[in-house]
Amino acid sequence: MNGSNETVERRIELRRPLVDTEKKLPLEVGLESVLTESSLPYRRRVYLGMCIELKLLLRLALPAILVYLINGGMGISARIFAGHLGSTQLAAASIGNSSFSLVYALMLGMGSAVETLCGQAYGAHRYEMLGIYLQRATIVLALVGFPMTILYTFSYPILLLLGEPKTVSYMGSLYIAGLIPQIFAYAVYFTAQKFLQAQSVVAPSAYISAAALVLQISLTWITVYAMGQGLMGIAYVLTISWWFIVGAQTFYVITSVRFKDTWTGFSWKSLHGLWSFFKLSAGSAVMICLELWYTQILVLLAGLLKDPALSLDSLSICMSISALSFMVSVGFNAAVSVRTSNELGAGNPKSALFSTWTATFVSFVISVVEALVVIASRDNVSYIFTSDADVAKAVSDLCPFLAVTIILNGIQPVLSGVAVGCGWQTYVAYVNIGCYYIVGIPIGCILGFTFNFQAKGIWTGMIGGTLMQTLILLYVTYQADWDKEVEKARKRLDMWDDKEPLQN
């Protein structure tokens, strides 16, 4: 009788006006309960589900967006300072940031394996393993950092080999030298970030990043204008700012009582299965790297066009604007990855699917608004970065391509977040190879160089690759069997209990 009464009470609660139950929905009426309540009309279930999911999603997405915007803003502010030193310095900083983003993508991608595992383990209430995953991932990423350090030490001859102008290559290599210590900051930052996100802890990272941005802008102004350190001063301050974030983030994880169940101190268990974890994270790294490197290749190819300085400056400004809007989508990427992995770990297939489409729709609407703002301000937006009229005109001409890219980026990163939450990274990596590097870049090179459409031609081809990838991910997500995904998540976590969690 008690079970029957509870069911009746829950149905009555669901049928009440939303204003009466709004504060109780996330805690007392779970999303899965709403979506599976057959006694409710379909529209009512969707409406209640949207209200619950938007609260859960935005609570994760908004702080995550702020974190990514601030972190992206650190790189953009460095370009702004460089741009006001001169066009050559702007080109050098742009080529340096674009080149260094390769290791950023690698570390971010490998860190995404933590997001899958920690998210599903947290949803299944296996809290004690989260700290082990964090330590193991940090060790693996730090080891990967050593060969990357050697690679970037030889950035000058590599840039020359890629056909970049000698002056830009030399100044860009000096700029990169000042960024090299960031490699190991990334190794700690991304694993800790995913550890926090899996537990829906995002706001503290936003506060830390905001403090770092203020520190960076202040110190950069001092080193550039008061101390006259120029481009190298900009690079050194950027590195210091990243290490400030890492130090504050690490201190928070170790000392906060909210992680008493998930962080139990350093453990020798973290040294076990490093090679297995490396293989698992490699799939995540390939997926993310292929996505992030794709846009950076556009900037590198611009250095081979007829007027490389103008092309680099205009495209780097467009990419900076695109990166800012992209951070909004990446925030939803992080949120939906946590939501889907938590729901799959908890055994809630309908909630995982509902979260996927809710995040995709909201991110798409925001991206359309952003694209309209870019088109409306196309003649003025570039003056934030430069005072050169020729560069401003070139940016204005490229804004329609930028607007289309922003809209596509409103969908694609969210679907990639779903892939991370579900553990589809390897499959998506193959999709990225085909769409980006077999279709997008070759078509872009043909249009840009053979048909002489220059930067517009390269960008057109790359938009085509992104569109193809987005359509494929939409289809795969639509066709997914979410009950099977729950079972896969359960088996993956059972493997962890068998002490062989990373064996496929």
Curated annotation (Swiss-Prot):
Q: Where are the transmembrane segments?
A: 56-76, 90-110, 139-159, 170-190, 208-228, 234-254, 273-295, 316-336, 356-376, 401-421, 433-453, 457-477
Membrane topology note: Multi-pass membrane protein
InterPro entries in the cross-refs: MATE_euk, MATE_fam
Where does it reside? Membrane
Q: Which domain of life is it from?
A: Eukaryota
**Principal subcellular localization:** membrane
Q: Report the record's Gene Ontology biological process terms.
A: xenobiotic detoxification by transmembrane export across the plasma membrane
Please verify whether the record's keywords include GTP-binding.
Answer: no
Q: Give the UniProt keywords, A-Z.
A: Membrane, Transmembrane, Transmembrane helix, Transport
A cellular component annotation (GO) from this entry: membrane
Q: Name one GO molecular function term.
A: antiporter activity
> Which protein family is it in?
Belongs to the multi antimicrobial extrusion (MATE) (TC 2.A.66.1) family.
Q: Which NCBIfam families match?
A: matE
Name this protein carries in UniProt:
Protein DETOXIFICATION 38
Q: Identify the species of origin.
A: Arabidopsis thaliana
